[in-house]
């Protein structure tokens, strides 16, 4: 493996948005550690990556298991001795509870402690703990990108979306704190969202016409910008893939798709004594 090749970890990489982003990075020459629970789908990524500039290393892991984070990092470091990019994408959606959630909302009083714990573990705790495991190596190298897939702000406060919306809101809040903690380290923390209902396995059967949904590949252009040298100084931002204009040069497209990470646009710091 060439010494100047960059390494990325992508969680939830075997299907949907995660697969599109992982293969986009492979196409850009990254060596990608593709993390997912589904070993069979992970294995199919090897053939898809064949002949591309980068490589795929499938890594089966359950991110609800606290032991998985250090194992993933060890795998990535064992391949190249470096980790340049962490893409926190793994998540569970409302359809895992009720496939018809689109017209039969999951009310908050239906949410059991077990369901709440499961959604928090995967959608909020996992990205935080993955960053905790990866970032010290990035800081030591003086460079690194943490990119986390959350969801549209409207989804975070939507009727019937306590499980998914609130857990993704927790993840975004955490990434804003990471961004503040990382100032001056050479490592950045940003959020990337599709900007609408996307045609992935997370979506239930009654969420509308799949032909009219956003496609997972919409995430690739903003992701490739965020991992490029042109995005070196960008921190504490959220990028909305649906607003990315592929007819523009990447820096101009980024300006159109970029807003502050939640909730910096409305945040007011509390009054401190003294």
Residues covered by each model-derived region:
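Canonical Rossmann dinucleotide-binding motif of NAD(H)/NADP(H)-dependent dehydrogenases/reductases
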Residues: 2-33
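Conserved glycine-rich Rossmann-like NAD(P)H-binding loop of the short-chain dehydrogenase/reductase
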Residues: 28-44
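The beta1-alpha1 cofactor-binding region of Rossmann-like NAD(H)/NADP(H)-dependent oxidoreductases
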Residues: 39-40, 60-72, 113
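Conserved mid-core segment of classical short-chain dehydrogenase/reductases
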Residues: 70, 93-117, 140, 160-163
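Catalytic loop of short-chain dehydrogenase/reductase
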Residues: 107-115, 145-170, 175-176, 180-184, ...
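A short, exposed helix-loop element centered on a Lys and neighboring polar residues
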Residues: 131-132, 176
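C-terminal helical subdomain
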Residues: 184, 191-192, 208-274
């Amino acid at each position: 493996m060439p010494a100047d090749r960059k390494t990325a970890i992508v969680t939830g990489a075997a299907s949907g948005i995660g697969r599109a982003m992982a293969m986009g990075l492979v196409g850009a020459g990254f060596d990608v550690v593709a993390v997912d629970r589904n070993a069979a789908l992970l294995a199919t990524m090897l053939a898809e990556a064949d002949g591309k500039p980068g490589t795929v290393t499938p890594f089966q892991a359950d991110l609800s298991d606290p032991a998985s984070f250090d194992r993933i990092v060890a795998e990535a470091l064992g391949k190249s001795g470096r980790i340049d990019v962490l893409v926190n994408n793994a998540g569970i959606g409302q359809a895992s509870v009720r496939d018809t959630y689109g017209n039969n909302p999951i009310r908050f009083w239906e949410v059991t402690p077990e369901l709440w714990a499961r959604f928090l573990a995967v959608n909020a705790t996992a990205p935080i703990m993955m960053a905790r495991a990866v970032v010290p190596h990035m800081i030591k190298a003086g460079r690194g990108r943490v990119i986390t897939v959350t969801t549209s702000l409207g989804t975070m406060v939507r009727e019937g979306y306590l499980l998914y919306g609130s857990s993704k809101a927790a993840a975004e809040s955490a990434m804003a704190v990471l961004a503040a903690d990382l100032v001056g380290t050479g490592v950045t923390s940003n959020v990337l969202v599709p900007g609408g209902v996307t045609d992935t396995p997370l979506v239930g059967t009654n969420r509308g016409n799949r032909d009219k949904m956003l496609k997972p590949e919409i995430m690739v252009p903003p992701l490739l910008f965020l991992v490029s040298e042109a995005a070196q100084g960008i921190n504490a931002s959220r990028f909305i893939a649906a607003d990315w204009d592929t007819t523009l040069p990447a820096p101009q497209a980024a300006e159109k798709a970029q807003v502050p990470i939640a909730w910096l646009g409305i945040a007011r710091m509390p009054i401190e004594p003294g």
